[in-house]
Amino acid sequence: MKIFGTDGVRGRAGVKLTPMFVMRLGIAAGLYFKKHSKTDKILIGKDTRKSGYMVENALVSALTSIGYNVIQIGPMPTPAIAFLTEDMRCDAGIMISASHNPFEDNGIKFFNSYGYKLKEEEERAIEEIFHNEELLHSSYKVGESVGNAKRIDDVIGRYIVHLKHSFPKHLNLQSLRIVLDTANGAAYKVAPVVFSELGADVLVINDEPNGCNINEQCGALHPNQLSQEVKKYRADLGFAFDGDADRLVVVDNLGNIVHGDKLLGVLGVYQKSKNALSSQAIVATNMSNLALKEYLKSQDLELKHCTIGDKFVSECMQLNKANFGGEQSGHIIFSDYAKTGDGLVCALQVSALVLESKLASSVALNPFELYPQSLVNLDIQKKLPLESLKGYSALLKELDKLEIRHLIRYSGTENKLRILLEAKDEKLLELKMQELKEFFEGHLC
């Protein structure tokens, strides 16, 4: 049975993520990390979901039972776990979060000792241990060999200092008015402190988590409230994070939501202008707009494509010796400062770009026009092999004939089918998207 999806393990808390399941997974992961253990320490953080306590306690029980010493740091962004795992010399880091999903869901993401997400072969190795009853039941420690657990509440300061170091030393934010939407999630403590200490005039919204309101009509998936607040507050910029703050959505001074591909393009060129790129390659996923590739080419930069998922972006960056890349959804990686997508690092770089451009953000963050694109996330009941659906191949051939770029895939974390179409003719695009929706609703819903 496959346990891992595209971003760790995710599911409904108490349904898939039961205490017994989590304990078993924790033991399996711990035994895998033991093979390369240097410190016998594992770091655990979480977002603000109510079920995080249940999942955390199950993981602590599992890991201490096989001899690991566990450091619990409470609600922190996913990229903070990646950073602190390496910074505190731990064998591994674990983030308890379902990212942008509703509060009823939860998830578990693993990081190696260098702060990188696990590769697929590492996940498969953990799955093999998970299904090995004999190995699991023969691994418990007794007496003094049992591990301990301790909670540390002040590591937030380390991450804040790290974030501030990512911001250019010759700049400050005193001339910027910024609205932050922390999605009642993991960034609710960190984000306001970082921007305030760098001098910004800050307004914070959705920063009162109660365990059940994470991502609820707020944050990166619902930036309309942020857009309204930016206009009302006459702010220069607005930043919306998702539940675990590895994703960023930017709103300009006019209240417009900045497209992720425009963000990738303008940030890539900004990094080049500072001689901060390690290569001429910038990494993006197959969902990126063709206009991004053309824009980067005009700036003597090369776009490298990879599979969807920020861990695949990271792997492709390493392969191409690149230090900048991301997804149009807002997972953007500056690998000089973060091994995974970090919404706060990205927000600081956007702020620096706007400051140095001496332009309004609505101008500075709008470097090129996009080709018409349509993205639909279709709720489905079943995940059948797409190639097995009668008429599917003919549909794709027709799209190719009409020169409509297409990317159709199942979500790795939810019961959704993601359909992306791109073409120069917007009306044709809308027509074909409706046809595709009706086709898949008839076969998968």
Swiss-Prot record:
* PROSITE patterns cross-referenced by the UniProt entry: PGM_PMM
- Is Metal-binding among the key words of this record? yes
Q: What does this gene product do?
A: Catalyzes the conversion of glucosamine-6-phosphate to glucosamine-1-phosphate.
* Alphabetical list of CDD domains matching this protein: GlmM
According to its UniProt record, which residues of this chain constitute the active site? S99
One GO MF term on file is: magnesium ion binding
Q: What is this protein called?
A: Phosphoglucosamine mutase
Requisite cofactors: Mg(2+)
Q: Which key words are in the record?
A: Isomerase, Magnesium, Metal-binding, Phosphoprotein
One Pfam family it belongs to: PGM_PMM_II
UniProt source species? Helicobacter acinonychis (strain Sheeba)
